[in-house]
Amino acid sequence: SIYFRYTALHQNVYEKVYTDDRDVILFWKTHMLYYVKTDRIFTSLNVEVDGVKFFFDASKMTLKKSNEKREVVYAFRKVQPEDGTLVFDVAYSEKGKTTRMDDILKDIKKANGKLDDETLNKAFRVFEKQSEVDFFINKDARAFLQEQFELWLYQYLFAGQNVWSEARLAQLQALKAIAYKVIDFISQFEDELVKIWNKPKFVRNSHYVLTLDKLGGSPVLEKLFTHPKLPQQVQEWRDLGMIGEDFKLEMLTQKDAAGAPLHKQYQYLPIDTKYFSDLELDILELFDDLDAALDGWLVHSESYQGLNSLASKFSEKIQSIYIDPPFNTGEQFDYVDNFKSSTWLSLLSNKLWLTKTLLTKTGSIFVHLDHSSDYLGRILLNDFFGEENFKNQIIWYYWNKFQMRGMGAYPRNHQSIYFYARDQKENHFYPQVTPLDRPKKLKRIFWDKEKNRIQNVKDTEGKVVYDEVNDTGLDDVWDIPYLGTTSKERTGFDTQKPEELIKRIILSSSLPTEMVLDFFSGSGTTLSAAQKLRRKWLGIELGSHFNDFYINSDGEKATGILGRLKEVLAGKGNHEPCGISAEEKWTGGGFFKYYELEQYEDVLRRAHYADADLFHNPYEDPYHSYVFLRDMKMLDSVEVDEEGNKAHFHPERLYPDIDLAETLSQRRGKWIKRITAEYVEFQDGERMSLTDPDWQTIKPLVWWQ
C-alpha cells in the first residue's frame, strides 16, 4: 500500500489532534489504511543445512484468500543427480492435507539420499522464515501523497539559513504543480483497489438448512424421502452423530403413535438443500415470508467485506453485537492471531465503523479482549461509539486450575468484555440474576413517607421481618469456567467460549426474535446460543472452519460452524445436547441460510484490465482523467442490445453459482418475501426479474468508477 515507511514525527492531517472536547486521540501508523490480510510471500529457495542441499519449489503456491490460516505442506520430488540437492514441492494445505515426515524420509532413502528428521525439520523452518507481509490499501492515496509532498517542501524551504531567489521559488512552484499532477495520476491505481475493496459483492453457493418438521405433511416431504441423494444426507446425519449406524431410511416415515407422517424422534433432523437443489424452490414456496421465517444467516466471508455487503439489508436491524476478535497474541490458533498493534487496530477499526449503521438505536455491542489488546480496544471503542456510551467493563473470571504457579507474575485468569451502547439514552438493558450458593436472609424494608426514609418491616411483636433470597443481581465479574478439553461442548476450536458466557450477554441486551450479530464467528458459539435462546442471528466467518468439518491446528478433524449449527437444529449430535440446552429446554428445530460472498481476491482474478492508451477527453486534463475508463473489468458478463438500448447480465459468465435473489436483496436493502424461478419478491411488494435483472442495480457489481 501507499503510506510512510517510517512513522512521521508530525501528527496526521486527517483529524485534529486537539479539540475543545478531546485532548487524547489514538494514533497508529496504519490508521489511513484498509487492512486486507497478513501473508507470507514465499519464493522458491535454495537452502543448505548441516551440509545437505535443499531446493524448495514454491512456484505453484497461491496467496491465501483474505486472512484465513493455512498450513504449509511439503512433498518430496527427487534428488538432483549432479549435486545431490533434495527437491521439494511446497503448497498450502487443502482439505486437511499434512506433511508426512516418515513417508518423505522413506522416499529420500529410496532415491539414494541420506537425511535425518532433525535436519529436515531445520530446513523446513529456514524456508518458513521468509518475510511475513501485511497487505493494506490506502483509503485516500491522493490526500496522503499531497500531505507528504507538502511536508517535504516545507522542510526543504525552511531547513538551514538558505536565502531563496525569486527564480528558485518559481522553480519550486512549478515542481509542486508537476508533483500534484503526477500524484493525481498515480493515486488512481490505489483508488481503483479501494473501489474493488468496497464494491458490493455477489452472493455465491447459497443453501438452506431446515428441520424436517418445517416441511410438515407437504408433498415435498414425500419427494425428499425418495430423492436419489437422500443417502448422502443420511450419511451427513451419521457423521454429525445425529443417528446411529443402525438407522434405516424407512424409520423416517414410520408413523408414531399419533399417526403423524414423520416420526417424532426424527422431526428435527436438518435437511441441507445442497443435496436437493432440484427441490429447493419447492421447499422455499412453503414459506409465505421467506426471510421472516429464517432464524439466521451464516456468511462465509472476510468480515469487512461481509459487513459492507450486508449493511443495507440489515441496517438498524441488529439489537446486540458480540465479537471475539483475534487477540494479537501470536499463539497457534485456528486463524492468524499475530499482528503488530497498528495492524490489529486497522483490522478492527474498519469493521467497527460499519457496525454503527447495523445497530438499532436501542442496541449494544460487546467486544471481548484480553490483556494484549484491551487497553487499545477501550480507546478505539471510545473513538467510535463515544465515551458517553460506555456502559461497563465485564470481567470474565474463568479460573484455570492448571495455571502454572511461580512464573514470576500473578497467574492470568480473566479477560475483559467491553460493553457499549449505540445511544446510552435509548439503550435497552435487561438486568440478570444469578443463583446464590446458599439462600440468604435480607431484611424486608419499605419507604416511610412521613419520616422520609427507609424503614425495616416489623411483625406484631416488633421483630424485624426477614425474607429468604435465593438469587442476586448479576454484577460485572462473571465467574464462568473455561471449557475443558474433554467438554462435550468443545468442538476442537482453540479459542471457543462457553455458551453460558454468551447467554448472559444475549439475555441482557435483547429479547426473543431480536437479532444478534457476530462477525468473528469462530466456533459459532454466539450463533448456537442465539438459536437456543430464540433470537435471530447473523454470523460472518472466513476459513475452512466455516464448513461441516475441518482440520484444526492440532491436525485433527473437528466440527466446523456449519456442522455445529446443524447439530443445534437437530438437538443432538457429537456435541449436542450441551452448553445451555438443558436449562433452556432446547430440543431442536430451525431454519437458516448459508452462503459465501465474492471476495476481494476473486475480483482481482476475474477483472480485466488492459495496457491501453488513455481515453482522450478534450475537456479534461489527462492527469485527472479516469485511467480505467476503457477497461472491461467484469463487463464480459454483460451483453449489450444496441437496438433495444438494453444491457443483459449473464451471471454464469462470472461464476457458476451466483445467488441472484440474495445479491439483489443486499443491493436493494430489502428482505425477501418469495423466490420463484422467474423473480424475487421483496417484503414491500417490489419484484425483480431473475432472468433479466435490472442493469442499474447490477452495474456496480461488474463495473465501478
Q: What is each stretch, according to the model?
A:
Residues 332-337, 404, 487-491:
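Short acidic, glycine/proline-rich loop/turn micro-motifs
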Residues 1-290, 295, 311-319, 352-356, ...:
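Accessory, often C-terminal, charged low-complexity segments
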Residues 319, 325-347, 351, 362, ...:
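Mobile active-site "lid"/loop adjacent to the S-adenosyl-L-methionine
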Residues 488-501:
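Conserved SAM-binding loop and adjacent beta-strand
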Residues 313-331, 381, 516-530:
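Conserved proline-anchored active-site loop of SAM-dependent methyltransferases
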Residues 305, 327, 373, 521, ...:
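Short, glycine/acidic-enriched loop or turn micro-motifs at the edges of active sites
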Residues 299, 366-367, 519, 539:
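Conserved SAM-binding loop
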